[in-house]
Amino acid sequence: MHVIVLGSGVIGTTTAYYLARQGAQVTVLERRAGPADETSYGNAGQVSPGYSTPWAAPGIPLKALKWMFQKHAPLAIRADGSFYQWRWLAAMLANCSAGRYSVNKERMLRLAEYSRDCLRTLRADTGIQYEQRTQGTLQLFRTAAQMEAARRDIAVLEECGVPYELLDRNRLPTAEPALARALDKLAGGLRLPNDETGDCRRFTLQLADKAKALGVQFRFNQQVEGLDVRGGQVAGVRVGGEQLAADRYVAAFGSYTRGFLRPLGLDLPVYPVKGYSLTIPMTDESAAPVSTILDETYKVAVTRFDQRIRVGGMAELAGFDLRLKEARRKTLELVVNDLFPGSGAVEQAEFWTGLRPMTPDSTPIIGATKYGNLFLNTGHGTLGWTMACGSGQLVADQVCGRQPAIRADDLALSRYGAGGQAGGGVARAQHNAA
């Protein structure tokens, strides 16, 4: 069986790897010069099932209003000129009830925990190295109110059997010794010992090499011009003036998947949420984190790689705008200087931005479509690295006709009632970016 995977970020590359492991002939099409060159390039570095929390949550609408007037707000909404942006926001607001929050968080935790297990198995099987650390994650609270609000998430963690430690201020240095210098700014934290960290781009580059060793063909610098659809099936991919045909197809174009598949009558509720990061050369190991923290106030993560510190986070809903904004850099610098002063050469940092493909319920879209041989793997939002291996394994199982190890039906596009019925004729979609 021949499968074409569209996209070679961490999602597309893990999908290709797991398909090849199951004996499929795999071709990956990517417009960039190599894997992990866009959204997977500079993310926060956290593999954090325990923090798999929906953005759509009770209280978020009120918080969003307050954030509009804050200089270092974690969320910013800027009109992109489209009606779709407001339709997507309305759908997100509809998921902010306590009931929807619980349903969505359970789905996210289920996939994220499974994905972490898949990552560990893959690491044991391949020996892949990506500056990984398995020392847990620590969510930091600056106020007592944040500590109290965390108890709602703790209830879900307990229900799902996820280990945790709730730490008061004085116990924070037991997890992150460098925080001893910043205790006066903190109220406490929530530690998740089973979470991990690692450089997503390095992982993806190495996994691509291992996929090639299994026979996967990567075709880079390829502009996908469209899909041909006939009789309820994808008949081929138009790329570089030629048509490539396969038995199955997987769309993993991240934020661009919606626009790519829209001409086919598939309505994917995916919106690009812009995030930022700094990658800082470490100068003082004793002042740096040993693993990773998430600052609940600013929604910014600070993660330790071998000799680098990655500071990432924030969310802008502003369409496909990839301009770097100095104000966002200042927020990232504020957090790392506040919590880990003197840990790195901030002035030498690489400043980066990328677009995360977010759904209104924060749960990815994984699985079949109304076209019998077209599958989706997109919409992971801020958790693409966390959910990558599990998502790749799930899609590979579905494509190859195997029973997935976890429930996956509620991850499919059909949960939105989107897409209608497959039709005949030819549909073509332009791929403007991958």
Swiss-Prot record:
One of its GO terms (cellular component) is plasma membrane. FAD binds at residues 3-17. One of its GO terms (biological process) is D-alanine catabolic process. It catalyses: a D-alpha-amino acid + A + H2O = a 2-oxocarboxylate + AH2 + NH4(+). Keywords: FAD, Flavoprotein, Oxidoreductase. Its EC number is 1.4.99.-. It comes from the Bacteria. GO terms for molecular function: D-amino-acid dehydrogenase activity. Pfam families: DAO. It is an enzyme of class 1 (oxidoreductase). Its cofactor is FAD. HAMAP family: DadA (MF_01202). Oxidative deamination of D-amino acids. Belongs to the DadA oxidoreductase family. This is D-amino acid dehydrogenase. It comes from Bordetella bronchiseptica (strain ATCC BAA-588 / NCTC 13252 / RB50). The lineage of its organism: Bacteria, Pseudomonadati, Pseudomonadota, Betaproteobacteria, Burkholderiales.
